[in-house]
Amino acid sequence: MVMGTPSSLDEIRKAQRADGPAGILAIGTANPANHVIQAEYPDYYFRITNSEHMTDLKEKFKRMCDKSTIRKRHMHLTEEFLKDNPNMCAYMAPSLDARQDIVVVEVPKLGKEAAVKAIKEWGQPKSKITHVVFCTTSGVDMPGADYQLTKLLGLRPSVKRLMMYQQGCFAGGTVLRLAKDLAENNRGARVLVVCSEITAVTFRGPSDTHLDSLVGQALFSDGAAALIVGSDADISAGEKPIFEMVSAAQTILPDSDGAIDGHLREVGLTFHLLKDVPGLISKNIEKSLDEAFKPLGISDWNSLFWIAHPGGPAILDDVEKKLGLKAEKMRATRHVLSEYGNMSSACVLFILDEMRRKSVEDGVATTGEGLEWGVLFGFGPGLTVETVVLHSVPV
């Protein structure tokens, strides 16, 4: 076998890599048609779970819903379905088969809806898609949701797929980090990223001994978001980045073991939350910012545009207070929380879409609310934090 010379290997490696940074070239979102109004949800939830006798707990749940700052949430689960599946309405009853039967079919379908919108905005033939990254915390199956999406969209059988299951709320940052690496290390790559989340795996009735589970029932919702990611946009073909990704990092916060846990059991996906999650995140967030922005010489956090996973209003409040952020910094984040709830991994991608939409509507100079540099944060089980440095583009 003839060994390649170092220079030719270097040339091959260079030829395989993109020249410029990865950019988000298109965004699409989708939600189930069925939705609930948060102010009405406590009455509905305690009625459908046959828990109206738990009057004190219902009052606590009402306060949770009031404090959530959520106006409405989309949910695939309808009242009719829940009436036919009473085990899903209990706090702990065997129900995994019924839950799996829903999500194995519906997660790829909802993902397809978002992907079709992203591909339409991108404006290129879907045959140009080289990679698929699919992320969900809703159910597991083989072949996975990545395979089902590839079939639903009619993508090439040679498309390179990556399936991420059971990551939780930080994973909107993870998919960006992975897509960035794929796009920048494979010249001409176009990565379809899809996060699709359906709460059929986590829905359950109330328990007065597990209030952390009730927090999830007040926050979680269904949604899917899709991106096309690629480097070296083909301007002549009509490609144009919406945001560019400059760097991406992941870290496990110190002293945070067990702060957020999820366990897939016969009863579905159980959710456990420690009270001090907002404190753990706000205490450690500046270190992540320092590490991410020191190379750029940026230390004024109000000079950035902000996209933060809206785990709940307490997290956003604590981060704002700790960093001295102006109230408008979290506008896009709080808007998505209000209108959609906590859609786990899909949230930050919805916020990207909301930010670019409002930037165009307001006539500001860039896709990042008129600012040049921004940060995207994902928070979730671990506690794991994803930090993505973004560069906006002119509107």
From Swiss-Prot:
**Superkingdom of this entry's organism?**
Eukaryota
Q: Which keywords does the record carry?
A: Acetylation, Acyltransferase, Flavonoid biosynthesis, Transferase
Q: Name one GO molecular function term.
A: naringenin-chalcone synthase activity
Q: Where is the active site?
A: 169
EC number assigned by the record? 2.3.1.74
Pathways per UniProt: Secondary metabolite biosynthesis; flavonoid biosynthesis
Q: Please give the SUPFAM superfamilies that the UniProt record associates with this protein.
A: Thiolase-like (SSF53901)
Q: Which Pfam families match?
A: Chal_sti_synt_C (PF02797), Chal_sti_synt_N (PF00195)
Q: Which reaction does it catalyse?
A: (E)-4-coumaroyl-CoA + 3 malonyl-CoA + 3 H(+) = 2',4,4',6'-tetrahydroxychalcone + 3 CO2 + 4 CoA
On whether Transferase is a keyword of this UniProt record, the answer is yes
Q: Which residues carry this modification: N-acetylvaline?
A: 2
The UniProt entry, under PROSITE patterns, shows: CHALCONE_SYNTH (PS00441)
Q: What does this protein do?
A: The primary product of this enzyme is 4,2',4',6'-tetrahydroxychalcone (also termed naringenin-chalcone or chalcone) which can under specific conditions spontaneously isomerize into naringenin.
The family database entries (PANTHER family) matched by this protein are listed as: CHALCONE SYNTHASE, HYDROXYMETHYLGLUTARYL-COA SYNTHASE
Provide the family line: Belongs to the thiolase-like superfamily. Chalcone/stilbene synthases family.
Query: What protein name is recorded for this chain?
Result: Chalcone synthase 1
